[in-house]
Amino acid sequence: RADEEGVEPIDIVNKYHSEFLDYWEKLSISWDNYTTTMTDNHKEVVHDIFLKLLDNGFIDKQKTLQAFDPIDNKFLPDRYVEGQCPKCEYGEARGDQCDNCSSTLDPEELINPVSKLSGNPAEFKETEHFFLKLSLLGEKLSPWLETKENWRPHVINWAKSFVKDGLKDRAITRDLEWGIDIPVDDLGDEKKIYVWFEAVIGYLSASIEWAKNSGDEDAWKEWWQKEEAESYYFIGKDNVPFHSVIWPAILAGYGQLNMPTNVPANQYILVKGQKASASRGVGKSLADYLSEWEPDAIRYTLASVLPEQSDSELTEEEMVRRNNEELVATWGNLVQRVFTQIQNNKDAIKTPSSLETVDEELLKEADKAFIEIGKYIEAVELKTALQESMRY
C-alpha cells in the first residue's frame, strides 16, 4: 500500500491506526488498551519470544528460495507475489495464503507467480533465513487440539487436518527494508522478522503494555499464566491457520504461557454472493455504513447475521428490515411503553408487601432467560444468544 501511494510504510501505519480508532469509537466499542505492533514494547517482546524459541531449538537457519523481481532488482515479500493457488486453482492467491480456500502457501508453490510491483513473472533466488520448526512443534499441538472439540467445526477440523498432514518449517524472516530487526547478527541488516510471525505476538505485547500502563508490570501474568485464565480469539476464517496452529505452536515452543481457550472464527460476510471486501470493491466500507446508520443498527444487524458456521449474506434490505421490524417495532416499542408507564405512574406505584403469582412467574422467566442466554454466550454462539434475547 505504501508503494502504491508513494509514501513511507510508517505513514500507512499511522493513517489506518487513526482510522480504525475513529471507527471503533463511532461504533461505541471500548477497550482497555488500543495499541500497535510498532511500539518498542512490542519489539522487546518479539525479541524475547524469538530468542527463547532459538534457545529451545525451535528456530534454526535454512537456505530457501525467495521470490525476486528482476525489474525492480529486489526480493519480494510474500504478499507482493500473486498467482494461481495450487490447491483450489483460485487465480489471485497471494504468496502466503489463498483467500479462496484459506490454505497457507509459500510463494514458490504458486502457479505462474507474478510480481505485484512490476506485473512481470517472479524469479526465485536462493537466500538464507531463520525458520520456525513447525515440524517439531506439531507433536505438541496434536494432543492439545484433541481437547478442543467445543471449537467450531470448520476451525477444529481444519487445524487437525493441517497438523495431521505434517507441518512444514516456515521462514520467519524475509529480505525486507522495513520491519523488526532480528535480535542476532547472523544474517545481516538487510533481513527483518516477517509479519506473520511477529503480528500474533501482539496479543501478548499488548497485555504487557496494558500492565505497565496500569502501574502493575506483572498484572499481565494473571491472564497469560494462571491456569483458570481463558483467552478467546475473534477472527475471520482466513486467519484460522495463524491462530489455531501457528500462534499455539509459538506459545507451546516458548512455554509457561496459556494456549488459546477458543478460536471462534467467523466465516465470510457475502454481498451478492461475493466475499465482502472494501479493497476489492465488494460491498460498502465501514465509513459508508457509519455515515448512513446509527451504531446500534450496524452492530445489531451484524450480530444477527454473524457467519458463525457458514457464510452469511448481508443486504441493504436486510438492514432496513431488522432495524424497522426488530429494533424499532419490537425492542424500541417495548422500551417506549415501559418508560412511558414509569413516567406517568411513578408517583402512584407502591412497593408491594408480597408478589402476586404473575409477578413471580415473570421473575422466574427472567432468571431462566439469564441462564439460557448466558450458556450461548459462554459457548460463543452469539447469534443464537441475540435471537433468544429478542424472543424472551
Residue positions per predicted region:
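Structured secondary-structure scaffolds
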Residues: T35-T36, N41-V45, I111-N344, A379, ...
